[in-house]
């Protein structure tokens, strides 16, 4: 099983999210303004060249783009000592049903954490 991880492939991430969250789980609209922000990192995973899953990770401040009521830093005790812009939120982790039960979600999470840290995250 050849696994490839990429960042910046929003169209592929959108496809996975549409299938998993909208078609399978029935959410009406899976997308928001955060998806379009250049600071939002979309991670996609491929198995033997075939799209299998995705996630997104972004600076906490972007959450207020979608929700003006989102909490301000520090949101929890773990945030103490972490500067604005150093807390990232990971979400929208999804794996296509045909690719599940292979440990792929954990690989997506690991890649998302690495991408966030590369972007300056200290707390995810």
Predicted feature locations:
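A short beta-loop-alpha structural element at the N-terminal edge
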Residues: 1-13
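OB-fold and OB-like single-stranded nucleic-acid-recognition modules
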Residues: 7, 33, 58-61, 81, ...
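Active-site rim helix/loop that mediates acceptor-substrate recognition in acyltransferases
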Residues: 18-52, 56, 62
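Short connector loops at helix/strand junctions that flank enzyme active sites
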Residues: 38-40, 50-52, 83-90, 119-121
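Conserved beta-strand in the GNAT
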Residues: 44, 50-60, 65-78, 87-94
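Conserved acetyl-CoA-binding loop-helix of GNAT-fold acetyltransferases
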Residues: 95, 101-114
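Conserved GNAT acetyl-CoA-binding A-motif
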Residues: 109, 116-124
């Amino acid at each position: 099983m050849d696994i490839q991880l990429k960042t910046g492939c929003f169209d592929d991430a959108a496809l996975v999210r549409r299938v998993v969250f909208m078609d399978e789980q029935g959410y009406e609209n899976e997308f928001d303004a955060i998806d379009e922000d250049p600071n939002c990192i979309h991670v996609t995973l491929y198995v033997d060249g075939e799209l299998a899953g995705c996630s997104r990770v972004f600076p906490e401040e972007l959450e207020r783009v979608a929700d003006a009521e989102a909490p301000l830093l520090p949101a929890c005790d773990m945030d103490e000592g972490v500067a604005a812009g150093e807390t990232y939120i990971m979400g929208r982790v999804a794996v296509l049903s045909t690719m599940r039960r292979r440990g792929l979600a954990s690989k997506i999470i690991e890649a998302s954490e690495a991408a966030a840290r590369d972007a300056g995250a200290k707390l995810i």
